[in-house]
Amino acid sequence: MGKITFYEDRAFQGRSYECTTDCPNLQPYFSRCNSIRVESGCWMIYERPNCQGHQYFLRRGEYPNYQQWMGLSDSIRSCHLIPPHSGTYRMKIYERDELRGQMSELTDDCLSVQDRFHLTEIHSLNVLEGSWILYEMPNYRGRQYLLRPGEYRRFLDWGAPNAKVGSLRRVMDLY
């Protein structure tokens, strides 16, 4: 079970709303979100309803302003509680679409895809175990995408506008 609290103002001030499960539309509960406190669980928050738009990964901790979660604005309109995973993590990445071309396998976090695999683009991937966060830049920066187990035959399947991938991180409550 997870628990996340959204606050309209910075530093956990103003009107607040608490969630313990997925919420496809947060608009009725607050008009803007400038701080968040995650008491338990791992969450994806989204700038638009129905888990659309820019997405941001949050784990247990305090985020006193939206820059702390690498947000671009104070617009948060939906959230998703990522189910906990208590096993191994495994993903295959491919340099071409349709799971073709050079393949590399990951079982742990990757701070820089370019340094580790000599790739700046990943065109398809197969998440075999666990959920992962894909970041468009190295060092877990830039746009973020939640990857659940399954095949992603092209970058559009995970919602990206291009195949640029900088880093990958396992979804875990604590690092």
From Swiss-Prot:
GO molecular function: structural constituent of eye lens
Domain Beta/gamma crystallin 'Greek key': start-end pairs: 2-40, 41-83, 89-129, 130-172
Keywords of this entry: Eye lens protein, Repeat
Superkingdom per UniProt: Eukaryota
Pfam families: Crystall
Region Connecting peptide, residue ranges: 84-88
Any one GO BP annotation for this protein: lens development in camera-type eye
Keyword Repeat (UniProt): yes
Domain notes: Has a two-domain beta-structure, folded into four very similar Greek key motifs.
Function: Crystallins are the dominant structural components of the vertebrate eye lens.
Subunit structure: Monomer.
Family membership noted in the UniProt record: Belongs to the beta/gamma-crystallin family.
Descriptive protein name: Gamma-crystallin B
Source organism: Macaca mulatta
Gene behind this protein: CRYGB
